[in-house]
């Protein structure tokens, strides 16, 4: 027995003997040790299994653990989850059972029998699991680990309970979840799936309405909505948006300034905001953007831009002061939240709204650009990508905040007209949107897993007019206005020589891998990393790592004081002063 293995087994023996130490802390140490051993055995594996359930399944397959041994490890995982999240009190009998389960797994993974000293103080093998949840006919959400698929079923392992055999999940069900069928061949073994609105069938199979691939990898709502173009909604549109620079910064700059105007009108008290003062704030907030915007270097275009700014300022004033209180809207700016951010692990998306009532009954997404002026003659309609964005915000409130979608009132504010448009679209459209999200995530995973120029070359080759023109458009509009931007990308890519292309693909792979690990975490990292730790790490883990401020109390708020007193400007630093209510000596700021 080498020294490393000896120390691993010795740590188990010490945990059993250290009776003075609280069981909850010993559970944490047991879990940390097991996760470290699992990570070390996966260091040279391309699979980014950052979730412990997926790691256990991978190790079970790699080292031929029996189903009983794997179920015992899952029982340990679930019990430690409950203990570390304070959902239950730790029990000594269960702790020693779980130490036995981990030791038995080590004996196979480390190819070294359990030392007699440790074996003698552990209970006998007990493979029977008690970690089964009560099943109901309709389940809101189930997290599972994908194994394989055939033409009718996905075969998966549940993450939140122990199962003796794979669950069978029906897919390709017409009108229910058939939109996800195209993406199933891209699923990989041990991938995490969220099954939403799941029906338990009489034959013991499951039929979900949504199948969400790798939900810990959050896709930005606005980026996902931008996949919906006039010519189609292919996932390669996501790649093109990432790679093609913005030709004209004017619309983006105007949108940012319009958002500033909305802030001013929402927070205004008796005295109305002044346009000139607001523009001065805009110049302070966006000095570089205004200085480098090419259109503003032309005197006529500069004049038109600031005329547009004043028009949007007036339209926002009209909307906030008049339309908000009109019959049918009942929007109250005094009880609103500006730019609330949301994370929706259920659907694997994230986003930020422009305006929301505090009770989440109504929300507004503001657009400074054009609506669809041509779909219906003489009528202004929201663009498809804007409708998609609103549907996704509704879905976030439904699945993350528990707000019934039928009680939500979403509005699109087109400040160009102005038009405050009730933007309720068909809920059935959410399914194909999430299916596109899955295909985007599969592309991202494939890029970082293969990490090879040839794979990336094939992926980026999808950015061509034939592939992206899913609606088979023809005629002047397609040929002169839509196709050229797609063709231009391919021309620039093809103009590179072999070395330049290889450099581009390698750089793209590197950035994609860094982005993937920054979101989902890195299997090779000693600690939990990535944005997903927000919901995957327990409070104890965050606290011990010094990565959370909690139980804080504001004792002085200087953040929102006005900059003026009458016409006189007042200089002050916007500050917030907090006081700890729970003393701690550990803080860690990355």
Task: Indicate where each model-derived feature is located.
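Short amphipathic alpha-helical face segments that pack within enzyme cores
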Residues: 28-32, 253, 257, 388-396
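Amphipathic alpha-helical interface elements
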Residues: 1-122
């Amino acid at each position: 027995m080498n020294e490393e293995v000896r120390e691993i087994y010795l740590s188990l023996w010490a945990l059993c003997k250290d009776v003075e130490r609280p069981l909850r802390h010993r559970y944490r140490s047991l879990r940390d040790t097991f996760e470290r051993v699992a990570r070390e055995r996966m260091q040279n594996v391309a699979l980014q299994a950052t979730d412990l359930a997926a790691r256990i399944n991978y190790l079970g397959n790699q080292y031929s653990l029996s189903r009983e041994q794997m179920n015992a490890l899952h029982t340990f995982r679930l019990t430690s989850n409950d203990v570390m999240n304070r959902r239950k009190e730790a029990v000594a009998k269960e702790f020693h059972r779980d130490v036995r389960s981990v030791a038995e797994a080590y004996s196979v993974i480390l190819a070294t029998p359990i030392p007699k000293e440790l074996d003698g103080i552990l209970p006998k093998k007990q493979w029977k699991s008690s970690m089964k949840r009560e099943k109901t006919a309709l389940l809101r959400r189930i997290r599972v680990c994908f194994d394989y698929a055939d033409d009718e079923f996905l075969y998966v392992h549940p993450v939140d309970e122990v199962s003796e055999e794979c669950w069978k999940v029906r897919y390709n069900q017409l009108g229910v979840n058939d939109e996800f069928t195209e993406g199933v061949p891209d699923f990989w073994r041990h991938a995490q799936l969220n099954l939403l609105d799941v029906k338990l069938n009489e034959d013991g199979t499951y039929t979900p309405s949504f199948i969400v691939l790798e939900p810990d990898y959050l896709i930005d709502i606005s980026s996902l909505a931008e996949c919906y173009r006039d010519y189609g909604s292919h996932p390669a549109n996501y790649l093109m948006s990432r790679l093609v620079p913005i030709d004209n910064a004017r619309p983006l700059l105007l949108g940012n300034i319009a958002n500033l105007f909305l802030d001013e009108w929402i927070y205004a008290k008796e005295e109305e905001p002044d346009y000139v003062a607001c523009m001065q704030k805009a110049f302070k907030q966006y000095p570089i953007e205004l200085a480098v915007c090419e259109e503003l270097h032309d005197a006529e275009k500069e004049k038109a831009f600031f005329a547009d700014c004043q028009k949007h300022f007036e339209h926002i004033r009209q909307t906030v002061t008049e339309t908000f209180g009109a019959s049918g809207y009942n929007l109250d700016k005094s009880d609103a939240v500006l730019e609330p951010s949301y994370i929706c692990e259920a659907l694997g998306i994230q986003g930020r709204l422009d305006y929301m009532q505090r009770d989440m009954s109504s929300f507004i997404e503001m657009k400074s650009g054009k609506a669809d002026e041509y779909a219906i003659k003489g009528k202004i309609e929201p663009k498809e990508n804007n409708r998609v964005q609103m549907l996704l915000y509704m879905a976030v409130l439904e699945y993350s905040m528990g707000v019934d979608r039928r009680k939500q009132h979403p509005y699109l504010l087109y400040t160009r007209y102005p038009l405050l448009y009730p933007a309720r679209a068909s809920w059935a459209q959410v399914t194909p949107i999430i299916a596109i999200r899955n295909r985007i995530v599969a592309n991202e995973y494939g890029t970082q897993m293969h990490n090879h120029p040839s794979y990336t070359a094939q992926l980026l080759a999808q950015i061509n007019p034939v592939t992206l023109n899913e609606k088979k458009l023809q005629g002047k509009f397609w040929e002169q206005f839509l196709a050229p931007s797609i063709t231009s990308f391919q021309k620039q890519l093809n103009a590179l020589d072999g070395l330049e292309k290889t450099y581009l693909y390698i750089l793209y792979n590197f950035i994609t891998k860094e982005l993937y690990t920054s979101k989902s975490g890195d299997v090779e990292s000693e600690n939990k990393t990535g944005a997903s730790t927000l919901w995957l790490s327990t409070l104890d883990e965050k606290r011990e790592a010094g990565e959370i401020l909690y139980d804080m109390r504001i004792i002085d708020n200087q953040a929102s004081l006005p900059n003026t007193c009458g016409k006189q400007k007042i200089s002050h630093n916007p500050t917030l002063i907090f006081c700890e209510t729970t003393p701690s000596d550990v803080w860690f700021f990355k």
